[in-house]
Amino acid sequence: MTPVSSRLQPLIIPCVDIQSGRAVRLYEGDPDRETVYFESPLEAARHWAALGAGLVHLVDLDAATGRGENRAVITQITAELGVPVEVGGGIRDRAAAEALLDAGVGRVVIGTAAVKNPALVRELIAAHGPSRVVVSLDARGLDVAIHGWAEGSGVSVAELAPLLAEAGLETLIFTDVTRDGTLRGLDRDLMRQVRQLWSNTLIVGGGVATLDDVRLLAEEGIQGAIVGRAIYEGTLVYPVTGL
């Protein structure tokens, strides 16, 4: 049997979720079920950068849920961290996306706006290139959720994937919201379904708990994962080795 390591080494991207100015993780995306890991999101990002992260994923949870925003904190991290960041949460239109890109963010992560208006993705890619625009589909099963996972969208990953590919999207983030922040591990069958629906770069946005989940990503041909609680609590040691 060919070793997993010779097939694929998934990229593990540390996540810093920001709520009320602090670095937190939520259980299944519920803003009222938070665990605070760092009082300073900048210190959280610096922690992962010091351990070798080449990319840090930032999420403005307050903007995603309409409770406020943490843009000043994100701008500070972008300016001071020294490694690229990608930013998602509450980016509802082209102006918001371009403000972040102009501030030096490596790439923007579009969620609800991409579901409601796939043409926005095409516009941003045409203006800034596919390397600076990512779409995140957050779903229960294959049913996509919007507005900080609080509402169903009425559309599925199967419906959206071809529209996004046609728009020129190269990288898709898929989050199983029923697993995010739970340390329950990945649903292999669901990961396989999504992999079949999206042939370009696929990043899993939640559910990785242990090294076995990273191995699962490699086995299913998934290029990486955004990881939060598992590396904060040590069920997965970062940087990841031992594949």
Curated annotation (Swiss-Prot):
Q: Single GO molecular-function term?
A: 1-(5-phosphoribosyl)-5-[(5-phosphoribosylamino)methylideneamino]imidazole-4-carboxamide isomerase activity
- Gene Ontology BP terms: L-histidine biosynthetic process; L-tryptophan biosynthetic process
Q: Does the keyword Amino-acid biosynthesis apply?
A: yes
A GO CC annotation given for this chain: cytoplasm
| Statement: the UniProt record of this protein carries the keyword Cytoplasm | yes
Checking InterPro entries in the record gives:
Aldolase_TIM, His_biosynth, HisA_bact_arch, Isoase_HisA-like, Isoase_HisA-like_bact, RibuloseP-bd_barrel
- Record-annotated active site: D17 (proton acceptor), D138 (proton donor)
Q: Which Gene3D superfamilies match?
A: Aldolase class I
Report the Pfam families cross-referenced here.
His_biosynth (PF00977)
- Pathway membership of this protein? Amino-acid biosynthesis; L-histidine biosynthesis; L-histidine from 5-phospho-alpha-D-ribose 1-diphosphate: step 4/9
Give the domain of life.
Bacteria
Catalytic reactions on record: 1-(5-phospho-beta-D-ribosyl)-5-[(5-phospho-beta-D-ribosylamino)methylideneamino]imidazole-4-carboxamide = 5-[(5-phospho-1-deoxy-D-ribulos-1-ylimino)methylamino]-1-(5-phospho-beta-D-ribosyl)imidazole-4-carboxamide
Q: Where in the cell is it found?
A: Cytoplasm
Q: Which CDD domains match?
A: HisA
The principal location of this protein is cytoplasm
Documented EC number(s): 5.3.1.16
- Alphabetically list the UniProt keywords: Amino-acid biosynthesis, Cytoplasm, Histidine biosynthesis, Isomerase
HAMAP family to which the protein is assigned, alphabetical: HisA
Question: PANTHER family recorded for this chain?
Answer: 1-(5-PHOSPHORIBOSYL)-5-[(5-PHOSPHORIBOSYLAMINO)METHYLIDENEAMINO] IMIDAZOLE-4-CARBOXAMIDE ISOMERASE
Family, according to the entry, reads as follows:
Belongs to the HisA/HisF family.
* Protein name listed in UniProt: 1-(5-phosphoribosyl)-5-[(5-phosphoribosylamino)methylideneamino] imidazole-4-carboxamide isomerase
The organism is Deinococcus geothermalis (strain DSM 11300 / CIP 105573 / AG-3a)
This chain is encoded by the gene named hisA
